[in-house]
Design a protein with these regions (language model features):
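Carbohydrate-associated surface elements
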Residues: 101
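N-terminal glycine/serine-rich phosphate-binding loop of ATP-dependent small-molecule kinases
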Residues: 1-94, 122, 213, 226-232, ...
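Active-site core segments that coordinate phosphate-bearing ligands/cofactors
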Residues: 5-6, 105, 112-126, 132-175, ...
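A structural motif corresponding to the C-terminal end of an alpha-helix
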Residues: 200-207
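Core alpha/beta catalytic barrel or barrel-like domain that forms the active/cofactor pocket
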Residues: 210-216
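Local beta-strand N-terminus motif with an aromatic residue
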Residues: 69-70, 208, 395
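Extracytoplasmic/secreted proteins and extracellular or luminal domains
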Residues: 63-66, 204, 391
Length: 488
């Protein structure tokens, strides 16, 4: 039996997972880390704590499993989150600015007003938004004096979380095309940093990592990982797409976690969205041409359930929400738009704020809980409808993964609203599996068509609602969305 493993560094926790050659989880360990909120627009992580949790996860697994048996390791990570550290000391200059952070809206407004850079920005496939790394780097340069000073000595590296982990493991500065494609500084056609964007905002190209294919050799760690080669690096959502075996054009998946992230494989074609979606790199295998995707992102999915629990105390645990929501046959006319820090795709409205509408004396916590769950399905509908418009074709089946797929009420409602079949695989850790599988494919030099690991369906849901009812629900959702827009 052969084994391959994954470092899965997410928004709220780090994990190390070992898989066997059949895709079964052999061992794993997970550790949550601290979320910092310096003000209402800011979300930060401690890069040192992130690394410490990764180390601890690997050590805990090593107590139970001989990691020398592992043939290869993949890294998958929260994307866009940006870290700046010293090349000479390895110490961070500042906390990691997380993808959810919106403090840089003024910088984004400044960028959008500058016509001289619009053509270059369009080549990134991304809209100008606080979500991506560019505005975070500009903010760090302007607001952290030690960074500005150290840049004059070529002693700064700006990187996404994958680059930070690769550095801590190997001492090198590397990233892959999927993570680079989330920075707003990467030309998705040439697969290089866009030097015009860098020069415009005084970001030295020497302060950025070397860009490599997703499936390639990133080196190894002498001590922690016993010289096991790191042969794949992917952003978390691309790893999920890969783990779902969406290797052919037109395959689509949606991940339900802290946020929601839907991706469709567009093959070697770069599809620039006209409907508010992102164009991104899905993966690149060695020197082959990259595979592209279009993506829709929702900021608040599972995070909305956490808000019910932590801020409103309507539920005590996240798992309770399904039973509470099932206490009522429907939402009682209540709709919730979780635009806590604006709306992502396809609306892209940073001035939107959360609204709870349709309340009456009849409304109760069960209706509100149901509305929070249903908001996840409605937001996903908006993403997937936009995808079909961009591609000029519809899809029949949606592959789903993430923690929220355990919620049967949500998945059935999603099938009803989409009017499509939904399936989930029997591998729950699909993101980590995707990165580990990619590493295994590279080390074995397999063709994607030769991957014969059988992913069985664990659950499926089919639509079971009248078209008239569906249209009524969607009409009310669209009215609620309009209420949330242009709030500030």
């Amino acid at each position: 039996m052969e084994y391959f493993a994954s470092i899965d560094q997410g928004t709220t926790s780090s994990r190390f997972i070992v898989f066997d050659e059949n895709g079964n989880v052999t061992d794993q360990h997970q550790i949550e880390f601290t979320q910092y909120f310096p003000n209402e627009n800011s979300v930060e992580h401690d890069p040192v704590e992130i690394w410490d949790t990764v180390v601890q996860c690997i050590k805990e697994v090593s107590k139970r499993f001989d990691i020398k048996k592992i043939k290869s390791i993949g890294i998958t990570n929260q994307r866009e989150t940006t870290i700046a550290w010293s090349k000479s000391t390895g110490k961070p200059f500042y906390n990691a600015i997380v993808w959810q952070d919106t403090r840089t809206q003024d910088i984004c407004d400044e960028i959008m007003k500058d016509d001289s850079i619009k053509s270059d920005l369009s080549r990134t496939g991304l809209p100008v938004a606080t979500y991506f790394s560019l505005s975070k780097i500009i903010w760090l340069i302007r607001n952290v004096p030690t960074i500005k000073k150290s840049l004059t000595n070529n002693d700064v590296i700006f990187g996404t979380v994958d680059t930070w982990l690769i550095y801590k493991l190997t001492g090198t500065f590397q990233t892959d095309v999927t993570n680079a494609s989330r920075t707003l500084m990467f030309d998705i056609e040439s697969l290089q940093w866009n030097e015009n964007i860098l020069k415009k905002y005084n970001i030295p190209i020497d302060s950025l990592a070397e860009i490599k294919p997703s499936l390639s050799n990133f080196g190894s760690s002498n001590n922690l990982l016993k010289d096991i080669p790191i042969t794949a690096v992917m952003g978390d959502q691309q790893a999920s797409l890969f783990g779902q075996h969406c290797f052919t054009k037109g395959k689509v998946k949606n991940t339900y976690g802290t946020g929601c992230f839907a991706l469709t494989n567009t093959g070697e074609d770069i599809v620039y969205s006209k409907n508010g979606l992102l164009t991104t790199v899905a993966y690149q295998y060695g020197n082959d041409k990259p595979t592209y995707a279009i993506e829709g992102s929702v900021a608040i999915a599972g995070a909305g359930v956490q808000w019910l629990r932590d801020n409103l105390n309507i539920i005590q645990t996240s798992e309770e929400i399904e039973n509470i929501a099932l206490s009522e046959k429907d939402n009682g006319g209540v709709y919730f738009v979780p635009a806590f820090s604006g709306l992502f795709s396809p609306h892209w409205d940073p001035t939107a704020r959360g609204v709870l509408v349709g309340l009456s004396r009849h409304s109760n916590k069960h209706h509100i809980s149901r509305a929070v769950l249903e908001s996840v399905a409605y937001q996903s509908y908006d993403l997937l409808e936009s995808m079909e418009k961009d591609l000029g074709q519809s899809f029949n089946e949606l592959k789903v993964d993430g923690g929220m797929v355990e919620n049967n009420l949500l998945m059935q409602f999603q099938a009803d609203i989409l009017n499509k079949n939904i399936v989930t695989r029997d591998i729950k850790e699909i993101t980590a599996y995707g990165a580990a599988l990619a590493s295994y494919i590279f080390i074995k030099q397999l063709k994607l068509s030769e991957v014969n690991i059988n992913l069985n369906y664990a659950s499926s849901w089919s639509p079971n609602v009248d078209a008239q009812v569906r249209d009524k629900y969607l009409n009310n959702w669209n009215k609620a969305i309009e209420k949330a827009k242009n709030w500030i």
